[in-house]
C-alpha cells in the first residue's frame, strides 16, 4: 500500500502526540469522506506493561481511539478545519470480534457518513489480516483549539 501521509505528516493534521498518537501512516484518503490508516502494533507499546503483562492484548478503547484519530485525519485536513480539533461525542454499536496483539498490523477504516454544522458521524472498522477486530459508529464534534 502506498503511503499518502507518513507519521510526521499525520502530526501536522491531528494534535495527538506520543504516547497517544495511535496511527503510523495513512494509505487511503478522500478529504472529508474517508480515511484508511495503519497501526503496527509493537510489543513495546506502553499499554502492554499493564494490559496484560502475561497476555498482551491491545485495549479496545485504544482501538476505538485509533479509529477516531483516523476519522480526524479525514476531517481535519480540509482547508476549513485546519488547526481545529475533533472531539469524541459518542460511540455507538461498538463490537470487538478479535483480539489485537503484538506483531499485528491494524488496518483502520473510517467513512464519514454525515456532517451537520460542527457535529459529524462516521462508520468505523478495524481489521487484522482481513479479519474484523472492531466495528463502531463514531460521533464527533469539531471545534477551534482554545
From Swiss-Prot:
Cite the entry's keywords alphabetically.
Answer: Cytoplasm, Lipid A biosynthesis, Lipid biosynthesis, Lipid metabolism, Lyase
The Swiss-Prot or TrEMBL record annotates one GO molecular function as:
(3R)-hydroxyacyl-[acyl-carrier-protein] dehydratase activity
Cellular-component GO terms for this entry: cytoplasm; membrane
Task: Read off the InterPro entries from this record.
Answer: FabA_FabZ, FabZ, HotDog_dom_sf
Q: Specify the domain of life of the species encoding this protein.
A: Bacteria
- EC top class, as a word: lyase
Q: Where is the active site?
A: 51
Main subcellular location:
cytoplasm
Q: Which SUPFAM superfamilies match?
A: Thioesterase/thiol ester dehydrase-isomerase
Q: Which reaction does it catalyse?
A: a (3R)-hydroxyacyl-[ACP] = a (2E)-enoyl-[ACP] + H2O
Name any Gene Ontology BP term.
fatty acid biosynthetic process
Would you indicate the residue range of the signal peptide?
none
The protein's matches in Pfam families, at most eight in alphabetical order, are given as: FabA (PF07977)
EC numbers, comma separated:
4.2.1.59
Family of this protein: Belongs to the thioester dehydratase family. FabZ subfamily.
Q: Describe the task this protein carries out.
A: Involved in unsaturated fatty acids biosynthesis. Catalyzes the dehydration of short chain beta-hydroxyacyl-ACPs and long chain saturated and unsaturated beta-hydroxyacyl-ACPs.
NCBIfam families for the chain: fabZ, PRK00006.1
Q: What is this protein called?
A: 3-hydroxyacyl-[acyl-carrier-protein] dehydratase FabZ
The organism encoding this protein is Staphylococcus aureus (strain NCTC 8325 / PS 47)
Q: Which gene encodes it?
A: fabZ
